Amino acid sequence: INKKGIVVDRASGFKEDLLMVEFKGPDVNAGEGKLRTDKKRIRYAASEGNVESVYKALVLGTRDYVKKCGFKKAVIGLSGGIDSAVTAVIAVKALGRGKVLGVTMPSSFSSKGSIEDSVVLAEKLGIDCQVIPIKSIYNAYTKTLSGIFAGLPFDVTEENLQARIRGKILMAISNKHGYLVLTTGNKSELAVGYCTLYGDMCGGLAVISDIPKTMVYDIAEYINRRKEIIPVDTIEKP
């Protein structure tokens, strides 16, 4: 930045870089000796937009956290929604497609479209996607609890059971294979409590937990700027 507050040179962000800047003018004091500069102009890194910067920060943060914690691979629950889709893309960008496992866990309440969107996303990212139905586990839970739940209506309790079953499956995979579970909740959901304790909050790193839902959509559009990676149905899903 020059004395007028104008950016005159910029190094690349979120990766190692070397920037050489030439100083000119009577106000430059080189101290003892001569300040030698190469007149050849070194490249000028383009200014990044806010969405691009946030995306790159999330990729770098995920890569560093996974590596420094001693993990080599990560596992993500794919719901067919935009949060898990964006998280999966960030994970693949950070770790590589061979180091990310996607798991979709449909129940009797899951739509066919959600399952298909999860599988399509995994195919486009080139990652393995395991489909593990949870209907029988869910039925076993509700049968076990039928006595103490007798006479009470179906409510958020049963909905949370599904999330907690999925969380247990992901943690079991983590324990058995040594993968880090990446959770997919965004800041808007966490701010209002739209999440399930011991369910979709289970994991070692909440990748997008510091960005609001609006930014999640912006990042999805940025990811799809050249070609469709995240299915359009996922982005347009209410």
Regions found by a protein language model. Give the residues of each.
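C-terminal beta-strand edge segments of enzyme domains
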Residues: 1-53
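Conserved helix-loop functional segments at active or binding sites
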Residues: 63-72, 93, 97-100, 143-147, ...
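A glycine-rich phosphate-binding loop feature that marks nucleotide/adenosyl-phosphate handling sites
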Residues: 71-84, 137-138, 186-188, 233-238
